[in-house]
Regions:
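Basic/polar, acidic-poor N-terminal "presequence/leader" segments
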Residues: 1-38
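Low-complexity, charged, repeat-rich alpha-helical/coil interaction segments
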Residues: 1-6, 64-70, 78, 99-100, ...
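Short, compact, well-ordered microdomains
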Residues: 79-107
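Short, contiguous, well-structured surface segments enriched in hydrophobic/aromatic residues
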Residues: 23-79, 85
Length: 119
């Protein structure tokens, strides 16, 4: 999955380790926690993994924009959930990425057409 990008050699022990492009340790833990809180909020409201059952992906695009615009207008926290608007927007980006990675663009739309052309 991940090709090595470089080789690390420990200066004290000489031990070697391939470094990969994917470096999850670089993701801010607090931001990741907020993303998990949004996932938990959604699971409480809609059911665990409800989003994997499919819905028109334009629903996530619309929600992403609503949360981003709320943040741009100076509102950091969502009134309903009390969680950061940017965490909600990030969750919808992640859902869209998951749909794309699983070739679900057609499966998760209201019709058989790829809705990206209408955005």
């Amino acid at each position: 999955m991940d090709e090595p990008t470089s080789m690390y050699t420990d200066p004290d022990t000489g031990a070697r380790k391939e470094l990969k492009l994917c470096r999850l340790s670089l993701i801010d833990p607090a931001a990741l926690h907020d993303l998990g809180s949004v996932a938990g909020y959604g699971a409480t409201k809609y059911g665990d993994n409800n989003w994997t059952g499919g819905y028109p992906w334009s629903h996530s695009v619309d929600a992403l924009y609503r949360h981003l615009l709320s943040w741009q207008q100076g509102r950091n926290l969502d009134d309903e959930s009390g969680l950061p608007h940017l965490a909600h927007a990030a969750w919808h980006c992640l859902a869209l990425l998951a749909y794309q990675q699983h070739d679900a663009c057609l499966l998760y739309t209201s019709d058989a057409a790829d809705e990206r052309s209408s955005v």
